[in-house]
Amino acid sequence: MKAFITYLYLVLLFAQSLSGFAQTDTSIQLSLNQAIDLGLAQRFDIKNQELAIQISESNREKIQSKNLPQVNASVDFRYNAILATNLLPPGFIAGSKEYTPVKFGTPYNTLTTITATQNIFNANVSGDKLVSQAQKEYDQVSLEKYKIDAKSAITQAYYQVLLNQEQIKLSEENVANAETIVKKGESEFANGTLIKTDLSRYQLDLSNAKNQLQTASRNYENSMLSLKTQLIVPFGSTIILTDGLENLINGTDQEANSSSNPEQRYEYRMESSMMRLNEIQAKKYNRSYLPSIYLYGNASIQNQNSKFTPFNTNTWYPYAYVGVHADIPIFDGFEKSRNITGYKLRTLQNKNNLEKLSYDIQTETVNTRNQLSTAYSQYQTSKENYLLAQSIMTVDQDRFNQGTLTAAALKNTEYSLQNAQNNYLTSIYNVLVAQVNYKKAKGEL
């Protein structure tokens, strides 16, 4: 119930945001956690899997109903236009030497019946109940799989948008710096202190900086489109991300270890659920050799007359009976035995898959831990280089403004700063993605 209320709240909040956007051109502001919650509430694959769980529950309840009394009523009205003829053997009627044709019954016959059955023991029904419960558990683990995959995709799409936002800011700064150098170069060229080739080189640098800005803008648009696709929101909506790369990386836990518990991974639990399902199927077929027993009863009242007189109580004749019915399997051509063998072999396959998954999960955990450690180490180095490049750029910018540093030397410093900036941003993104992959490998996402 709590999950339903949360889901309803998110949907209403999102619908209100989109309504406001359509009317007043407002934007949707999302933190990473809000984006994940919104995406989980919107995604069609998750909705379908939730419906699959409801279908499994409905099937389980349907099977349980087979153990409840089954009561039916019927009414049959019959008009015998020509009564059936029966032959009595010779001698049945005194003096008869040949078969004597006779007709029994009345032209009008109305039968009202109530029948009831109640299972006493039915191995198939109890087996189906266990199978339906195991299927529901498998569907629940599958829902967890969809949610974890969605969290991973949304998180990485969110990170990519943030990275491209920062790339745009850096590209804009590079364009501004290049424009400053071009303006000063044009002044020097006019004064005759700068040759045409050097000015053309500055102008080329400005053109390249503008191209990089356009590329960064296109990358941002593509990444935003990818995020909207993950969140299932209208492509025309405007999304503003409230988290930043620096804030997100400061909130990550870098204490990585290689310990792993395969049972925390949905892949392992899905295989375990499938193995349990196959084991239950084998038991179900094994128990189908047992007899099925049920009680039954019938209460009827019949109207017979030469005329149609349904309201004449003197022409109604009741009867009733009860009994016990048993179906005993004797020979089915070895069908049950072969089904049991098939499910036992599938169970062995499941066990092999679980062993392989356990090994693969441990390997993946170690690999993602190493990738996270490497990414974080590169991040620390890139951060130091970026801070150093910033300080050098500050000094050289002052020297350039004072006329003690050439534009070419300043350009070299700017290139170094650009590389340091790009490496720094990329290292942040790599740490965040590595953190997601590591948590997913450990089953903690």
PLM features: residue spans?
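Sec/SRP-type N-terminal targeting helices
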Residues: 47-51, 64, 109, 120-147, ...
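Short segments within alpha-helical structural elements
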Residues: 211-233, 387-444
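A small-residue-enriched
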Residues: 40-120, 262-333, 363
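Heptad-repeat register of long alpha-helical coiled-coils used for dimerization/oligomerization
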Residues: 29, 33-36, 43, 119, ...
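Periplasmic alpha-helical coiled-coil/stalk elements that build and connect Gram-negative outer-membrane
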Residues: 3, 30, 58, 149-262, ...
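Sec-dependent signal peptide cleavage junction
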Residues: 18-41, 45-53, 221, 236
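Bacterial Sec-dependent N-terminal signal peptides
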Residues: 1-32, 43, 67, 425, ...
